[in-house]
A protein has these predicted regions:
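Class I S-adenosyl-L-methionine-dependent methyltransferase catalytic core
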Residues: 1-217
Length: 217
């Protein structure tokens, strides 16, 4: 079986809140933490490898538990932080520039704050999402020291993550064997696996996971 140096994933977390979980299930199939833990990721991970995993503030503990269950040790909980802008924020920025309503730096900051996505939250309203990095063995050598943490991107389709993060991971770790789990489509240079992915590159067997893994060159 092919082994991967870099494993990137956005797990389909199952919310305990019925409203939140129902909203997620309207767009994709969610999976319990128990079943996620039993996905045999350790069988495809190289002896020295890196896991980059998306999670929200509701799933901090679960993300750490899942990384451990897959054989990884979390090294940083905030390798990347995506600041979410409303899907049409770019149009309103362009309009403000054309109309001359941005007079100074403070105007720009006000508009940036106004255009960040306002999600739910029991304390503050969430408008960011994080990627942790965990390692197995010695992990991977860092190929670039100029990769930044914060990603500013507009929202796409429901739960769709910005392509910029995969690009930065490529810069960070170079040309290694890499795969995206729970993928919805294929990316050049990446293998992929997921029940919505048109061409899977590997086979996983488990309680809910039987499918097959493909690389786009």
């Amino acid at each position: 079986m092919k082994k991967y140096d870099l494993i990137y994933c956005d797990p389909p977390w199952q919310y305990s809140n019925k409203v939140s979980n129902g909203a997620a299930n309207n767009h994709y199939q969610t999976t319990s933490l128990f079943d996620l833990k039993h996905l045999p990721v350790h069988t495809i991970a190289a002896e020295n490898s890196v896991l980059a995993m998306w999670y929200t503030g509701n799933f901090v503990q679960e993300a750490f538990e899942l990384a451990k269950a897959w054989g990884f040790t979390v090294r940083t909980s905030k390798a990347f932080t995506w600041i979410k802008f409303n899907s049409l924020a770019h149009e309103r920025f362009d309009k403000a520039l054309q109309n001359g309503t941005l007079f100074d730096f403070h105007d720009m900051l006000d508009l940036l704050n106004a255009e960040t996505k306002m999600n739910g939250g029991n304390y503050t309203r969430a408008n960011s999402e994080d990627v942790l990095i965990a390692t197995r063995g010695n992990g991977l050598e860092r190929m670039s020291a100029s990769v930044k943490q914060v990603v500013f991107r507009c929202l796409g389709e429901h739960s769709q993550k910005p392509w910029e993060v995969k690009n930065r991971l490529e810069q960070l770790y170079g040309d290694v064997n890499r795969i995206e789990l729970f993928a919805r489509d294929m990316s050049q240079g990446w293998d992929a696996w997921g029940n919505e992915c048109p061409n899977n590159s590997i086979e996983f067997t488990g309680p809910q996971f039987i499918t097959k893994a493909v690389t786009i060159d």
